[in-house]
A protein has these predicted regions:
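Active-site and donor-binding regions of nucleotide-sugar-utilizing enzymes
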Residues: 7-147
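Conserved catalytic-core segment of nucleotide-activated headgroup transferases in glycan assembly
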Residues: 15-27, 139-209, 304, 308-310
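Catalytic donor nucleotide-activated moiety binding site of glycosyltransferases and closely related
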Residues: 32-42, 46, 187-222
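Active-site regions of enzymes building and remodeling cell-envelope glycoconjugates
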Residues: 45-56, 78-86, 210-219, 252, ...
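Donor nucleotide-activated moiety binding/catalytic core segment of transferases
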Residues: 53-60, 201-248
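A donor-sugar binding/catalytic signature common to diverse glycosyltransferases
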Residues: 71-72, 77-85, 223-266
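Catalytic binding pocket for nucleotide-activated donors in carbohydrate/polymer assembly enzymes
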Residues: 104, 129-130, 210, 242-304
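C-terminal amphipathic helix plus adjacent low-complexity
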Residues: 283-355
Length: 355
């Protein structure tokens, strides 16, 4: 049988760590994977990974499926369109329904993660009727629950990771800059500060880079792979970001600043001066807090067998085997499709005339 071809679609740097476990499973099965990376996203491929640099190359590659951890996927790419999500449904803002559950008409398959997402998407599947939902677990979870990732850090001094979200009105970075600088100077802790690629405020970035430059115990990390940071840290300071949950997968505590949905799994504070005492409590790993963390993470991601990527590929096989039986037609989405073509400069008819 001829090897299957799969396309991995990247719009932002966080996609690499989500898609690489899937790529490993594809290769393990004897099939092939290639990457298409949007023009404004940094290329961070590893040796041996295949990079399709043009839209024409991606279309001609003719994959059986395309995987996207973002909100959209080019409809003109061949193959089954698979949504993998860029995180978990944690509700960053105060809202009735998280935008995690927004259906935009791009995807054929939604690969859900667990009880926090599957029931909602099953209801949307019934409501819309043009896609199928499979609970597979998140491919990135294969990395989190591997034995090597679960190893506890051995730091001489406690390490605090600070990865604030970019979301307006939720981001803690403007409010905590002075307090973090004070704690860096007065507490026996090491700090790692890293920002989401969408957090682009130049004053905020410059302020935290200055703190790192002036304090030997502070690192400002810039790069797409946050996993080594999560592994190294003993505790996290954050606000309302899905990276909180990912850190908790490693059985580690989190202090949040004005979290939009606080609960017993978090140590949430509402004033900057409370951050230091909260971090001290987190570093002591109270038994009740750690028990709540384990229950919370299981609600979001019960799949701990490192086979989420395998289930994603099995879902694609099942979708193809069943065909479109019982499915409605996708919406035309003409305006969205036109905007996407304009954004990606995809005009195949013009290409034909130019030949």
């Amino acid at each position: 049988m001829e090897p299957k071809k799969y396309l991995l679609f990247v719009t932002l740097p966080y996609a690499y760590s989500i898609l690489r476990p899937l790529e490993r499973e594809i290769r393990r099965r004897g099939d092939s994977a290639a990457w298409f990376i949007e023009a404004d996203c940094p290329v961070a491929l590893e040796e041996g990974e295949v990079h399709l640099k043009t839209l024409r190359e991606a279309v001609d590659y003719n994959p059986v499926a395309v995987f996207a951890p973002g909100n959209y996927i080019p409809d003109f790419f061949p193959g089954v369109k698979v949504a993998l999500f860029h995180g978990y449904a944690i509700q960053k803002r105060i809202e009735t329904i998280d935008d995690h559950f927004t259906v935009r008409g791009w995807f054929d398959i939604y690969c859900t993660q667990g009880p926090s997402s599957t029931p909602y998407f099953k209801e949307l599947e019934r409501q819309y009727g043009f896609f199928r939902v499979y609970e597979t677990g998140w491919p990135k979870a294969d990395t989190y629950f591997s034995p090597e990732t679960q190893l506890k850090p051995r730091n001489e001094r406690p390490v605090i990771l600070y990865p604030p979200t970019f979301t307006r009105n939720v981001c803690s970075a403007p409010h905590l800059m002075k307090e973090i600088e004070l704690l860096a100077k007065t507490k026996p802790w090491d700090w790692i500060i890293t920002f989401h690629p969408k957090l682009t405020d130049p004053d905020i970035i410059a302020g935290y880079k200055r703190i790192a430059a002036e304090n030997d115990n502070v690192i400002f990390f810039e790069g797409p792979d946050k996993m080594p940071l999560l592994q190294r840290a003993d505790a996290m300071l954050c606000d309302s970001s899905s990276i909180i949950l990912e850190f908790m997968f490693l059985d580690k505590p989190v202090v949040t600043f004005r979290n939009s949905h606080p609960g017993p799994h978090l140590i949430d504070v509402d004033r900057p001066e409370k951050v230091g005492p909260a971090l001290e409590r987190a570093l002591s790993r109270p038994e009740e807090l750690m028990r709540e963390i384990r229950a919370y993470t299981m609600h979001h991601e019960p799949h701990r067998d490192c086979r989420c990527s395998a289930r994603v590929l099995d879902a694609v096989d099942d979708y193809i085997a069943r065909g479109h039986a019982g499915l409605k037609r996708k919406p035309l989405n003409l305006i969205r499709k036109w905007k996407l073509r304009r954004h990606m400069h995809y005009y195949p008819l013009l290409e034909m005339f130019r030949r």
